[in-house]
């Protein structure tokens, strides 16, 4: 008679949880390996991308890839099984490799930020030294400092520890592979692996943000100066002929209608964001009578002025041309002219004041239209810069701060040990930073995006036969 085993609801829930946990860990490990390997492939196939900043990002990808290949597979099996199922000697190697790769990854983040900080704050002095040799020194310093922290227990520090890395629980039936239970080493490793590089990272990115903000402020100021002087002056000078044409109508009512029409056109142009810094183009044709001696009247002469005014617009199709052709009789010196000179000067003065007020209004509207676009571009760039810095620091802090807080707290508070599931979640939250780094440090790099697109979309070219 065969006995059948029926799973209880508790067993089914536990099995489902294990399956989901194993699937999530498997996908995380797979993505960490794939994404960081992709960074290497792109850098290898594109020599143009092998610059100092990209080499530092490549070293970051190498440390994350090493974590994904060596540490994460063992850690995932350990998390699913709930105990250390590998040989005892492998426990020390696992812990040392974990500290080495995690520390190198964190320090690489700081070095990438430090390189950007030097390039922005000391461009002349640093750019002369920013070469592959400098990048090699920085990369070597990262791995040396990480090795001094991770290999310290193997070099004799663990001899003073009360318990080794591998401990036995539940009547010596369950083995657990843990970090070295030694307060001095805990402080040493946490300080060197997290707190110092974190402070350095926040400092350099804060300075980068300050330098970025000052640069944008100076750029806006220079744009304002350009708008206030050269561009505005050229625009006003180029439209003098067009503005003077408003003096010619003798009817005040007609001049008022023309003025209101121009105001409405200028307002509509600014509201639609069409103002731009293009210079107005003036074409002036002064036409003289060919047969002046024959056609000139004894009492009057005719002078014709034709002006073509192209207003400053942002789109070609918005070019505004106005042909103004006025014939003004100029009386010769006579008694009638002398009597009418004073009223004419009065009319001209009134018309000139109207034109002057209208020109001042147009100048203010034009100035605002030119200033609006640089401010919008500056604000967009500043928001993007702040967004990138926020993502870098935010992801790093969210991923690693809980782990190192728990790491130090548990060492000095034995009763503060979290639940096994919470401890596993916090540990893997730190590991997940290695899966995010390839996205954060490459998605905002346009050159990398282009190279990555070419890597997946480029077709194989037919091989050309070489002549022997």
From Swiss-Prot:
Expressed in the pharyngeal neurons, MCL/R and NSML/R and the AS group of amphidial sensory neurons, ASEL/R, AGSL/R, ASHL/R and ASIL/R. It is a multi-pass membrane protein. GO terms for cellular component: plasma membrane. Residues 44-54, 115-134, 210-387, 445-468 are cytoplasmic. Residues 252-306 are annotated as: Disordered. GO terms for molecular function: G protein-coupled amine receptor activity. The keyword Transmembrane applies. InterPro entries: GPCR_Rhodpsn (IPR000276), GPCR_Rhodpsn_7TM (IPR017452). Pfam families: 7tm_1. Glycans are attached at residue 171. Residues 1-23, 78-91, 158-186, 411-424 are extracellular. Coiled coil: none annotated. Keywords: Cell membrane, Disulfide bond, G-protein coupled receptor, Glycoprotein, Membrane, Receptor, Transducer, Transmembrane, Transmembrane helix. The keyword Membrane applies. It is found in: Cell membrane. Disulfide bonds join 91-177. Residues 255-265, 281-292 have a biased composition (Acidic residues). The chain crosses the membrane at residues 24-43, 55-77, 92-114, 135-157, 187-209, 388-410, 425-444. Belongs to the G-protein coupled receptor 1 family. G-protein coupled receptor for tyramine, a known neurotransmitter and neuromodulator and direct precursor of octopamine. Expression in amphidial sensory neurons suggests a role in chemosensation. PANTHER family: ADRENERGIC RECEPTOR-RELATED G-PROTEIN COUPLED RECEPTOR, TYRAMINE RECEPTOR TYRA-2. This is Tyramine receptor tyra-2.
């Amino acid at each position: 008679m065969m006995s059948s085993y029926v799973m209880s609801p508790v067993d089914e829930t536990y099995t489902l949880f294990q399956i989901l946990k194993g699937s999530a860990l498997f996908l995380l490990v797979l993505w960490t390996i794939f994404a960081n390997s992709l960074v290497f492939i792109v850098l290898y196939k594109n020599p143009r991308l092998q610059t100092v900043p990209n080499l530092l990002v490549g070293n970051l990808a190498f440390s994350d890839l090493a974590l994904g290949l060596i540490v994460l597979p063992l850690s995932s099996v350990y998390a699913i099984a709930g105990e250390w199922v590998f040989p005892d000697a492998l426990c020390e190697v696992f812990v040392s490799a974990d500290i080495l790769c995690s520390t190198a990854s964190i320090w690489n983040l700081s070095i990438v930020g430090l390189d950007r900080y030097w390039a922005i704050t000391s461009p002349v002095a640093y750019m002369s030294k920013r070469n592959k040799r400098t990048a090699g020194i920085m990369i070597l310093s990262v791995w040396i400092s990480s090795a001094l922290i991770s290999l310290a227990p193997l070099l004799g520090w663990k001899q003073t520890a009360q318990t080794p890395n591998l401990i036995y629980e539940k009547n010596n039936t369950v083995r657990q592979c843990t970090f070295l239970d030694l307060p001095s080493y805990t402080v040493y490793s946490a300080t060197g692996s997290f707190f110092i590089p974190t402070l350095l990272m926040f400092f350099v990115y804060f300075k980068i943000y300050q330098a970025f903000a000052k640069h944008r402020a100076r750029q806006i100021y220079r744009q304002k100066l350009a708008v206030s002087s050269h561009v505005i002056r050229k625009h006003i000078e180029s439209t003098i002929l067009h503005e003077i044409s408003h003096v010619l109508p003798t009817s005040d009512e007609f001049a008022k209608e023309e003025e209101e029409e121009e105001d409405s056109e200028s307002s509509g142009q600014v509201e639609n964001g069409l103002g731009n810094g293009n210079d107005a183009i003036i074409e002036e044709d002064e036409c003289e009578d060919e047969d002046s001696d024959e056609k000139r009247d004894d009492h009057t002469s005719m002078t014709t002025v034709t002006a073509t005014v192209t207003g400053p617009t942002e789109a070609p199709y918005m070019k505004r041309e106005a042909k103004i052709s006025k014939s003004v009789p100029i009386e010769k010196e006579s008694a009638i002219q002398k009597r009418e000179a004073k009223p004419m000067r009065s009319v001209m003065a009134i018309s000139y004041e109207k034109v002057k007020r209208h020109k001042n209004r147009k100048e203010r509207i034009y100035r605002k239209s030119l200033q609006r676009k640089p401010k919008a571009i500056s604000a967009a760039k500043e928001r993007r810069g702040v967004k990138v810095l926020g993502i870098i620091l935010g992801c790093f802090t969210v991923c690693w701060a809980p782990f190192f807080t728990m790491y130090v707290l548990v060492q000095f508070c034995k009763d503060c040990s979290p639940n096994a599931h919470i401890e596993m979640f916090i540990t893997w939250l730190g590991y997940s930073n290695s899966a995010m780094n390839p996205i954060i440090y490459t998605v905002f790099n346009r050159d990398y995006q282009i190279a990555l697109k070419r890597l997946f979309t480029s077709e194989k070219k037919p091989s050309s036969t070489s002549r022997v």
